Amino acid sequence: MTISPPEREEKKARVIVDNDPVPTSFELWAKPGHFDRTLARGPKTTTWIWNLHALAHDFDTHTSDLEDISRKIFAAHFGHLAVVTLWLSGMIFHGARFSNYEAWLSDPLHVKPSAQVVWPIVGQDILNGDVGGGFHGIQITSGLFQIWRGWGITNSFQLYVTAIGGLVLAGLFLFAGWFHYHKRAPKLEWFQNVESMLNHHLAVLLGCGSLGWAGHLIHVSAPTNKLLDAGVSVKDIPLPHEFILNKGLLTELYPGFASGITPFFTLNWGQYADFLTFKGGLNPVTGGLWLTDISHHHLAIAVLFIIAGHMYRTNWGIGHSIKEILENHKGPFTGEGHKGLYENMTTSWHAQLATNLAFLGSLTIIVAHHMYAMPPYPYLATDYATQLCIFTHHMWIGGFLIVGGAAHATIFMVRDYDPVVNQNNVLDRVIRHRDAIISHLNWVCIFLGFHSFGLYVHNDTMRALGRPQDMFSDTAIQLQPVFAQWVQNIHTLAPGSTAPNALEPASYAFGGGIVAVGGKVAMMPIALGTADFLVHHIHAFTIHVTVLILLKGFLFARNSRLIPDKANLGFRFPCDGPGRGGTCQVSGWDHVFLGLFWMYNSISIVIFHFSWKMQSDVWGTVDAAGNVTHITGGNWAQSALTINGWLRDFLWAQSVQVINSYGSALSAYGLMFLGAHFIWAFSLMFLFSGRGYWQELIESIVWAHNKLKVAPAIQPRALSIIQGRAVGVAHYLLGGIATTWAFFHAHILSLG
């Protein structure tokens, strides 16, 4: 940390705006394509509508003025936040108006969550299944009831108020988006002042946000949940404001409150140990993390981030400068190191977005795993349908975000990369030895593909020939995941040793006891064996192929031996012009397109693995003697060793419910299962046929229309190659995801 001389204090945190830079014009809004000179002329061919959608949010094509682009993105963020808060408000309103939340709250072990009742128009009311407690509706698997219980919400009136609050917030965000584009628009200098932005995001949003949440957890959630756990009737539990206003109510539950704020300033923090705990493990009543542990966690996070928010140099000449940190970051093998990255990040929002998407996508996948290993909300762990669905949901989201990160990194390379700024820095050096990177990665993919798949092929062959003693399995030739087992073991031994104050392990997935709630397993040690070793290497294979495709698109975005001037062709182009055969499907966009399919492969294997492994080795019932009966009876270790086992004992065996769902409350999933298969198959029509085929067909149809004097004024055109592939991949992913959704839901919901 340095104190800088006055001439270096170039980044004063000032509020710098332009007043009324862009008039609010409804006439402009009413003109489709007003942002593009060609589109504004109106449609001549049907391609116009596709280009309109492709370019509406591509602000780079509207203007080259970085300040205007920055303002548009900033305003769009407020619009996005408005949509999110509106959507959440709708969810919470459903909970208030159409749900059995209060019935569920009084008996979460036997009443299932439902927040939608179908109206009987053509017999759809068959979908309103009996969810217990005399309520009929569609069972939901979003985990919202469990979250609300964790928040401390005890009645539907509180949900109504929260829903209205969400609407108000959405209105404020919409106003803010309009205001900061049309009335008071920040100057480019404000957007590029990274130190001030870090201070605000770290200290205010993350730090104070976590601190506020810790306050809510301590003063409202923890006492409410403690009373609910003790079996106190909902109507006898004090309302949130009563806990806040009446200290006596809190002191009864947590005596540490009696000493007030004094122990904080006298550093006698042990006084607070009853509501800021470090227990580890799960609450045996609810199967969720201890709310007092969660409070402690958020308080610690708040302290860290509030300190972090004070580390960067703004108005007072002390603290770090991001540019200096980056430019001093040199190693013996990295040339100019991170020099130039500051300029990349502050002049290219694509570069900034790419890193954010990669981080956020990875974080989302980490969240997916924490949700079952350390279930944060009460009664989440024993709601198997919700557990399966939120895992699947977070995995898909994470996959899409990571591919988006690669997409925007590639757009940065094409549109924003400046070779003058990036001379012998890490980015330049990576690009210059891209051949070594890609060829090695390709070798890794081939190795993993042949070996991981080869193990399964061997096992299928041995089983087919009746030679089980020659298979790779826990009972024949063992391939134990010894490193994973070692990691599990050190985590199990941590309480009392490396984590001296923890009472239980961080997660029972590593080891320890079985936590059962109401006779159902919430979490227990997940034993790993040969079958896990095999599928782990399939994961490694699919992830590495996804990375290969996306990284190749990024590293060869500007040029390649095949097309040296690729940067001039843009992010998406079909081929390198006429007379250059073999140059199709090489654009940055095409790599993202291919990467999406491999992302789909990767995530599909992960969610299938999770679904079967949990049903086989974790989820199930516990009798009075402590014996566990798993849903699929522990068949993972022997069945998941062969491809045939995956097809027969997972896909086929567990599709029974969706295939036989007609005439039951789950019949919508049967229809969705078929419908989504059709959407998926429809995608193949776009992916397997060429543009010329369709253009010929269209011209024949136009001829017939001309004969009948009904030819349209807007000339029909076949989709371009890129448009066709975009429609294809969209339907492929939509169809595949919805098929999986119906398959998982019908199976897991039918198990109760």
Curated annotation (Swiss-Prot):
Residues binding chlorophyll a, per UniProt: 685, 693
Protein's cellular compartments: Cellular thylakoid membrane
Cofactor binding mode and count: PSI electron transfer chain: 5 chlorophyll a, 1 chlorophyll a', 2 phylloquinones and 3 4Fe-4S clusters. PSI core antenna: 90 chlorophyll a, 22 carotenoids, 3 phospholipids and 1 galactolipid. P700 is a chlorophyll a/chlorophyll a' dimer, A0 is one or more chlorophyll a, A1 is one or both phylloquinones and FX is a shared 4Fe-4S iron-sulfur center.
Keywords on record: 4Fe-4S, Chlorophyll, Chromophore, Electron transport, Iron, Iron-sulfur, Magnesium, Membrane, Metal-binding, Oxidoreductase, Photosynthesis, Photosystem I, Thylakoid, Transmembrane, Transmembrane helix, Transport
GO biological process: photosynthesis
GO molecular function terms noted in the UniProt entry: 4 iron, 4 sulfur cluster binding; chlorophyll binding; electron transfer activity; magnesium ion binding; oxidoreductase activity
Segments passing through the bilayer: 73-96, 159-182, 198-222, 294-312, 349-372, 388-414, 436-458, 533-551, 591-612, 666-688, 726-746
Protein residues bound to phylloquinone: 694
EC numbers for this chain: 1.97.1.12
InterPro entries (UniProt xref): PSI_PsaA, PSI_PsaA/B, PSI_PsaA/B_CS, PSI_PsaA/B_sf
SUPFAM superfamilies: Photosystem I subunits PsaA/PsaB
Membrane topology: Multi-pass membrane protein
Listed name of the protein: Photosystem I P700 chlorophyll a apoprotein A1
Lineage, opening ranks: Bacteria, Bacillati, Cyanobacteriota, Cyanophyceae, Nostocales
